[in-house]
Amino acid sequence: MSDKTRAAAKHTLANLKLLIIDEMSLVGADMLYRIHKRLCTILEMNENTDPFANINVMLVGDLMQIPPVMGHQVFSEPKDKEILSFYNGLGDQTIWSKFQPMILKHNHRQGESKGWADALNEIRVGISTQSTEAVLRTRVTKEEHLDEKALHLFYFNKDVTDHNDKMLKKLPGELISVKAVISVPRGTKTPDIDPGKKTIANTEFKDVFEFKIGARVMMIHNKDLTDDLFNGAGGTIVGIEYSDKQQAKCVIIQFDLPTCGAKQRAKYPNYSGRYKRFNGTPVFRHEHEFNLKTKSYGKKYFHAAKGKLLQFPLRLYYASSAHKIQVKL
C-alpha cells in the first residue's frame, strides 16, 4: 500500500469506533487476519500487540451455518502460509482468542411454529430424528408442481449456471446477447473467463449476458443503496430500449420490491413512462473497474494493474448459490 493510499484510508477511518462483520460463518480465518493486518497498516499500529488496530470488532452470526468457500473457519488456523506463520508466532494470544462470546438464546425468526423451529435447530447440529423428517416431508413438493419462477438453490456455481440457462431456453421470444466491452493497459493480458459462472475473472459480470423479455434477473452491483438498487435485488425484464446503432442501451426491469428504483424512474421518465404499468425501472450498462492478475509467483498474485469493463450489472435469477442467499437473508 502506497503512502498516499494509506493516508487516504487513514483519513476515511479516522472516526471508526466499531466494525461489525455479519454472517461470521462465511468469514474465513485468512480473511479475519487480513482485516486485522490491514487495519494495523492503515492506522499505523503494531499488528503483534494491537488486535484490529484497537478498533472494536463485533462478529455476528451462527458458526453452525455455511462455512467459508475454500477456506478454514474463522476460529481455525489460517490456510495461507504467510498468514499461518504470523498466526503461529502469536502463541496462545491469537486474534480469535480476543473475542468474547455473547449467545442469544431465543429464536424469533420462526414465530409461533415451534415444530418447524425445533426441526431447523436439529438440522443445524446435524441431527435428524423421525419428528424432524416428518416435518420436512410436509414441505416436499414435486418439481412439476413448482411455479417456474421458484428460486432453486445449488451448492456449486456450475449447477446455478446450468439451471439458469435451461430456464432461459424454455422462455419464448428473441434471445438478446450483450458482449462486455473490456479494456486493459497496453501489454496486459485480457482476463480469463470463469468456466463455471461464465463471468470475467475477479468480477461477477458476465462476459456475454444473454436474456429475453420475461427473464428473471438479479442485480450484481450496488447501484444506489438509497434507491434500493442493491446487489441481490431481483426482478423481471419487461422491456428493452435500443440505441441508434440497434444495440441494447438499457433493459427495463419490474423489480420484486416496488421501492426499488423509484429515483431511477424519476430520473429517466422517457423510459419509465413507457413501462409505467409495470413500474418499470431502466437499468443501463455499468462501467466497472477490477483487478487484473498480472504477476504470479507460485500461487501468489499481485494486482499491479486494473482493467475496466462495460456490461449490464445483471445475471439470470432462476437459481442461486446457497452462499449468496445466506448473505441476503
Language-model-detected regions and their locations in the chain:
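Conserved ATP-binding/catalytic motifs of P-loop helicase motor domains
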Residues: M1-L329
